[in-house]
């Protein structure tokens, strides 16, 4: 079996000791997806539309190379993973044939050897947007994400309302003014076997599903960090999935980014240190929600975190800062550290740069 790596998995491959942050992305890049296979980084979708690019991190002249365009149309919030030398792309949010925004549950496969895409005859049993994907023992695992029916219905209503501002305000109030459990975010864990292209039930969270969580895995353990508990309301929760002994166990670790939490953060591991950085949220939303205001982020401004946290001795410590707050980029394992590609900053501005975060002796180094 070829080396299998997800967009957020940890790789211990040996890279050059003087590896630098990558060249700027060909276009401002946010809300897309990415993966790394051995020495080559792949990114695409999101603000790049249907475009995909690759970059050989070992090349002397590092540059992004355009690949065949994604055949499924522009997508936000898709996820991707490499398994046995092929890149798999799961779901996302885009336009259907009628031009309506919707959540997809499909799977596409990219073959790097032929630079070609194929849509698989495979559909997840639920929509995939805001979900996370990781690989364990040759299978892709998916959990979290919004409810497909509720999300699609919201955008169908907005489309029918058109420019009627009164109707739009009513739709938004109805959509956001509900309790977290009424959004039915996905708390199931699904597995996808690329050899059969079949989906299976693999378990479920004893707590609740999230959307826009950060995910990272190493060995038999996977961590889901923060994310939305409902539209506009984040959680500071951290969940650990432990596959040790082939018996999946769900654990809840100490919270981080408290009290409001963030979504779209970045996670990785460097020298066995678990890293969580960045993300976006609404300060004060958790207090509003606890005080009975379901539309918890109404009137609040989205803020972007600069914080870098390390998991150490059973708790999170703020151990550094990004040069600017950012969220909704791609996290990749690179050179035994965390590589962040793109993302958005204040005002939702997509960026082209990358950030490299490494840890040694519990000390954080940030390279821009």
From Swiss-Prot:
Q: Where is the signal peptide?
A: 1-19
Main localization (coarse): periplasm
Which keywords describe this protein according to UniProt? Answer: Carbohydrate metabolism, Isomerase, Kelch repeat, Periplasm, Repeat, Signal
Localization, UniProt: Periplasm
The question of whether Signal is a record keyword is answered with yes
Q: Where is the active site?
A: 228 (proton acceptor)
Each Kelch repeat, start to end: 40-84, 86-137, 139-173, 174-219, 222-265, 287-336, 338-367
Enzyme Commission number(s) of this protein: 5.1.3.24
Q: Which domain of life is it from?
A: Bacteria
Q: What GO molecular functions are on record for this protein?
A: racemase and epimerase activity, acting on carbohydrates and derivatives
**EC category name:** isomerase
Reaction catalysed by this enzyme: N-acetyl-alpha-neuraminate = N-acetyl-beta-neuraminate
Repeat as a keyword? yes
GO CC term (a single one): periplasmic space
PANTHER family per record: LD33804P (PTHR45632)
Query: What NCBIfam families does UniProt report for this protein, alphabetically?
Result: muta_rot_YjhT (TIGR03547), PRK14131.1 (NF010730)
UniProt cross-references to HAMAP family, sorted A to Z: NanM
Return the similarity comment.
Belongs to the NanM family.
Q: What does this protein do?
A: Converts alpha-N-acetylneuranimic acid (Neu5Ac) to the beta-anomer, accelerating the equilibrium between the alpha- and beta-anomers. Probably facilitates sialidase-negative bacteria to compete successfully for limited amounts of extracellular Neu5Ac, which is likely taken up in the beta-anomer. In addition, the rapid removal of sialic acid from solution might be advantageous to the bacterium to damp down host responses.
* Assembly: Homodimer.
Q: What is this protein called?
A: N-acetylneuraminate epimerase
Say which species the protein is native to.
Escherichia coli O139:H28 (strain E24377A / ETEC)
Originating gene:
nanM
């Amino acid at each position: 079996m070829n080396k299998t790596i997800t967009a957020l998995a940890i790789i211990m491959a040996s890279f050059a000791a003087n590896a630098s942050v990558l060249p700027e992305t060909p276009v401002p890049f946010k809300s897309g997806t990415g993966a790394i296979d051995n020495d080559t980084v792949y990114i695409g979708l999101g603000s790049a539309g249907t475009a995909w690019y690759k970059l050989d991190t070992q090349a002397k002249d590092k540059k992004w190379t355009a690949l065949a365009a994604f055949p499924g149309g522009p997508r936000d919030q898709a996820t991707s993973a490499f398994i046995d030398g092929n890149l798999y792309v799961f779901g996302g949010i885009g336009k259907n044939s009628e031009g309506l925004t919707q959540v997809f549950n499909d799977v596409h496969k990219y073959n790097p050897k032929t630079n070609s895409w194929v849509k698989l005859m495979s559909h997840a049993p639920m929509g995939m947007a805001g979900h996370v994907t990781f690989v364990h023992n040759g299978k892709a695992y998916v959990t979290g994400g919004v409810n497909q029916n509720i999300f699609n219905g919201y955008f169908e209503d907005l489309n029918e309302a058109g420019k009627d501002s009164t109707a739009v305000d009513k739709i938004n109030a109805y959509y956001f003014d509900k309790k977290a459990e009424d959004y039915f975010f996905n708390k199931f864990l699904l597995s996808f076997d690329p050899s059969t292209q079949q989906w299976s039930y693999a378990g479920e969270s004893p707590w609740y599903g999230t959307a826009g969580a950060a995910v990272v895995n190493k060995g038999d353990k996977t961590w889901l960090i923060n994310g939305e508990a409902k539209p506009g309301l984040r959680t500071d929760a951290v969940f650990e999935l432990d596959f040790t002994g082939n018996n999946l166990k769900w654990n809840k670790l100490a919270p981080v980014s408290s009290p409001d939490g963030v979504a779209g953060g970045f996670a990785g591991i460097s020298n066995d240190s678990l890293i969580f950085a960045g993300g976006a949220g609404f300060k004060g939303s958790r207090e509003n929600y606890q005080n009975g205001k379901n539309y918890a982020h109404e009137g609040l401004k989205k803020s972007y975190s600069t914080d870098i946290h390390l998991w150490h001795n059973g708790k999170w410590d703020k151990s550094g800062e990004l040069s600017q707050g950012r969220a909704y980029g791609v996290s990749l394992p690179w050179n035994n550290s965390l590589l962040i590609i793109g993302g958005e900053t204040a005002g939702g501005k997509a960026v082209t740069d990358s950030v490299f975060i490494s840890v040694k002796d519990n000390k954080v180094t940030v390279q821009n």
